[in-house]
Amino acid sequence: PQPPAASAAAQQTPADETLTVRFLDVGQGDSILLACGDETMLIDGGPVEEGQFLVSRLNRLDVAELTYVVNTHPDEDHCGGLAAVLAKYPAEHVYSSVTEYTTKVFSNVVKYADEQGHPVEVPQTGDSWTLGSASVQVIGPVQTYSDPNNGSLVLRVDYGGTSFLFTGDMEQNAEADLMDSGANVQADVLKVGHHGSPTSSSEAFLEAVAPSIAVISVGEDNDYGHPSADVLARLEALGTTIYRTDTQGEIIITSDGQTLTVTTDPTSREPAAGKDAPFIGNRNSMIVHSANCAKLPGEDNRVYFNTAEEAEEYGYQKHTCIK
């Protein structure tokens, strides 16, 4: 079934409602959770290894179900964690730029969506729906592309007088086509395309968006050199405030329909417990040990917790050393 179309009523924001947009800290990938009223939308799911983290993060944020799951395109660093999410959380609508792709990773997303009885759908450019009192519109892609990056779903979210633009991994030729189409790309907040890659975020496109805030979802010390110094310079030249998940952790932007408030959470992945904490987790295996266990992980792979229950909230499982 098609979701309800966005209407002019979405411009009227209730006094007691806010739109919260969380750019989750999923390393070299994208995952963004939007919540407005009692509805939620997850845009992308980071790489496969982030699936367990995403499930634990949604759990800690008291998310019971997802109204919309949107995969901008089937690259692993955008769809990888969605299978774990869909295996755990009911979703009313699941969207992607395609319904089939050559990878097992994307096939798993399709499988879990099918099992829920909500098969993956490809929304058409121009489609819109409501998220609480916010409106969501698919404004791209405006052409068919052979490159999945350029075929990314491009979403515009408006809440009162505030606006967000989510571009997936759209690159410069698709940016130009989008501008030529006459789409309204101006937005207060831009999710910077392709993790700040120099193949995205042309000067002309950034000038057209004219964001006051730009968010780059990117992995620390990644192999790609993201974000590009050129892209950062272009944003700085516009006076845009830049936030990055690799240096600031989770980025939370809240809108009341008029004003945007930005906070950062460097502890979204790991608590701020000290090294003398009684429980030590293994980042790779997601197993937590008591501090006196003989099988502790190496120093570089340790996460510290004050209680075993806290570790479980972060998605860790207890080792047999914990009774």
Model regions and ranges:
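Non-globular, low-confidence helical/coil segments that flank catalytic cores
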Residues: 1-275, 295, 301
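Short N-terminal "domain-start" leader segments
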Residues: 273-283
